[in-house]
Amino acid sequence: MQKPAHVIEIFLQPGDFYFGDKNTRIRTVLGSCVSITMWHPKLHIGGMCHYMLPFRQGSAAELDGRYAEEALHLFLREIRLANTRPSEYRVKVFGGGDMFPGLNRRGRCEPLTNREEISACRNVSCKNVAIARSLVALHGFKIEAEDLGGDGHRQVIFDIWSGHAWVRKALTAVAC
């Protein structure tokens, strides 16, 4: 599908969530945070979240996009409102960069498979990557593409009219 004549440009800050239609381009910049994009190829609807942490300690009345669990529930709410099913969406996941690679005392992330392991982990980027994979699978989605982990930050651009997402990684400076 061609780029629409009038494009709505959305920039997500940490904790933001947006779900829209074919006239929308969503951008964000990620460090240790993670973004999940979802796109419905027939209806040309979809969205992106930019979460900061896997889950909230305690409870609240409203869903908060700063937390992965709640961001996924925001997606599920929009999917229900559109009378669609999770299996109809194409999912891509980005981010989880190690922003302080020199301080990483344990090397690369170990696989984290449950809430207890995720809670116990001290590396927020590893926690965010693990919870993304876990929640996406739990709710019946399949990840079509991902760009996760590594060092430093990245910019993500997601076009809802086409479902395409682009990632631009920043060159990381190393102090000597």
What label would you give each PLM region?
Residues 104-125:
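A charged helix-plus-loop insertion that forms the helical arch/lid used to bind
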Residues 21-23, 32, 40, 126-127, ...:
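N-terminal intrinsically disordered, cationic/polar leader segments
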Residues 21, 40-44, 160-162:
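Short acidic-glycine loop/turn motifs at beta-strand connectors
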Residues 87-95:
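Short glycine-rich phosphate-binding loop at a beta-alpha junction
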Residues 12, 26, 48, 143-147, ...:
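General beta-strand structural signal in soluble alpha/beta enzymes
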Residues 1-4, 9-28:
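Phosphate-centric recognition/catalysis
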Residues 26-82:
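Conserved mixed alpha/beta catalytic, RNA-binding, or beta-rich assembly cores of soluble enzyme
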Residues 119-176:
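Divalent-metal-activated hydrolytic enzyme cores
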